[in-house]
Every structure is written in structure tokens, then in C-alpha cells.
Amino acid sequence: MKRLVIVPLLALAACVQPKPLPVLGQLTEFQLTAQTGQPFDSRSLDGHVWVADFVYTTCDGPCPMMSSQMHLVQTQTAETPDVKLVSFTVDPAHDTPPVLAAYAKHFQYDPARWHFLTGDPARLNDLGLNGFKLNGVDGSLSHSTRFVLVDGARRIRGYYTTSEDGFLRRLVHDVRQLEREKP
């Protein structure tokens, strides 16, 4: 009798769809400069699931750890090459395209998937504070220790604090979930 109950329950569990991730915000279009020195238009990310972070190359605090973790995201999502990664600098005065290119190479980035962006300081600050809704100090963007998950319609679908246990596993799970939701 117990077998008769368990088999239908297992079949039902296999059909249950995961709960959709919430929509936490909407990003507007932006134009910045990539580590290649070429213009980067956010529209190139449209239709792609992507993960963002804010770092700077001379940081001796959490940035190297975050970039290493972003490399793990790159590795753990290698089977889905449509997933993009975007690292924004919070120190554009120092982090020129050549500096970002050297930093990217150090973290073994895949140039087809992982972009390092710089640009106008006011624009980057506005994007971090008002676009991504990351906390700043005194109205300016200080690097956050959170990753941000964005869907192909530029909607923010998750925040992941790097100091929380299991954040990377949850982030990669949610990336894969958004990939499965794509039309």
C-alpha cells in the first residue's frame, strides 16, 4: 500500500515548477567602456541572464575574493554560455581599460562571457546606487559585497551577499532557473 502512495507523489514532485524569482528592480540602458577599450552597450546583454558585481583593481579587501567567486560562477555555468558576467569598477580614475584587461586576465576571464566596465564616475555611481540599488556611503558608491542577478529584460532578480553561507550555490541555482525560464 505504501508503494502505491509514494510512486504518484514522486511523479507529482517531478512536475512541480520552482517558484519564479521575484522582480526586485528594473535597470535602464547604459553605455560604458569595456576592458578592451571598446564601447559597451547594455543592450548587448538583452536576452541574457547575467551576474553583476562592483569591484576595483587596487582593493586589498573583498574585491579579489569577489572576483575569484565570479570566476567560480563562470566555471560553474560553463554549460550555459549565454550567461554573462559583468564587473563594474568603482574606481574609474585608476581602472582604465588596460588596467581592467590585466585584472581580468589575472582572474582567467572568458572574454566572450565576462565583461569589465569603466566609464564616467558619476554614471557608474548613479548606476550602482539608483540602478542596482546598492548601498553607498555619503551618497557615493562604495564597492558592495553583493552579486546581483539580472534577467534578459534587465530586471533585477536577486541579491547575493558574499559573506552568507551557501550564497554561491544559491546564485548558480538561480542563474540556472532563470535560464530554464527563458522563452
What do the PLM-derived regions correspond to, one by one?
Residues 2-8:
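Sec-dependent signal peptide recognition
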Residues 11-14:
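C-terminal motif of bacterial Sec signal peptides marking the signal peptidase cleavage site
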Residues 16-18:
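Bacterial signal peptide processing site
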Residues 27-28, 50, 144-146:
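Short loop/turn microsegments at loop-to-beta-strand junctions
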Residues 30-50, 74:
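A short beta-strand-turn-helix
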Residues 42-70:
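Short active-site neighborhood of thiol/selenol oxidoreductases, capturing the structured segment around
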Residues 67-127:
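Structural microenvironment flanking redox-active thiols in thiol-disulfide oxidoreductases
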Residues 138-183:
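Thiol-/selenol-based redox modules, centered on thioredoxin-like
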